[in-house]
Each structure stands twice: as C-alpha cells, then as structure tokens.
Amino acid sequence: MAKQGEAAYAYFLKGYNCSQSVVAAFAPQLGLSEEMALRMSAGFGAGIGRMREVCGAFCGVVTVLSLVYADPADPQDKSRMYALVQEAARLYRARNGGDSIICRELLAKAGVHPE
C-alpha cells in the first residue's frame, strides 16, 4: 500500500486531481491502462467536479474498492459493498482527523483555502 501511496503522490505532483491520482496508482493491479484510470476518475476531483463535496481521493478509494470487490452477479453484493465503503470511510475519517470525508472540510482543517 505504501507503494501506491507514493505513486498517488507522484501523480498529484504531475497535476492530476486527487481521484485520478489514487485510481492511477492502482491501475496496474486493477488491469487498467494508465489512460483509462485517469479518464474514468477525472470528474471526481476537487470534491466531485470542484464542488468541494465528497473528497476526490475518497472517491478514488471507492472506485478501487468497487473494481476489486464488486460482484454484479451476486444479489448480496450491494449490501457487502456498502459495508466495505462505510468501513473505508471510517478509516479515512480517522486518518484525516476523525470527522469528515468532505473536501471543503478537509481542506479547511489543513489550512488550505482553494480558489
């Protein structure tokens, strides 16, 4: 996981948004081309379309989890995926101060005030 974190950071430094950076970092393990990973996650950046709503990085996490664990042929899958995403949100909140997955709140907490 540290390797993907470093890769995500490198993508971010190249100018890709948070969501793109996360998904592209996992592209090799997901069997995706870099281009496909970057394209499929482009709209989730900056809190989904720069609306500062759900964190783009967290949207990237959900995309990766869905690609790895979702099974559309399994009728029980929806509940299992929701539980997995909820646990990921709990861990994400804990790692980022404990109370949010909302972009504007995370940025404010970090002292970042984007345009």
Predicted features and spans:
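Conserved phosphate/anionic-ligand binding catalytic regions in large, soluble enzymes, centered on
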Residues: 52-60
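Short cysteine clusters
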Residues: 18, 55, 103
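Transmembrane alpha-helix interface/packing and boundary motifs in multi-pass membrane proteins
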Residues: 44-51
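DPxDG-like acidic metal-binding loop motif
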Residues: 60-68
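Acidic-glycine-rich active-site phosphate/pyrophosphate-binding loop
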Residues: 26-43, 100
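Polybasic, low-complexity association/targeting segments
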Residues: 1-12
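Amphipathic alpha-helical interface segments
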Residues: 24-29, 64, 77-115
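Short acidic alpha-helix initiation/capping motifs at coil-to-helix transition points
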Residues: 14-20
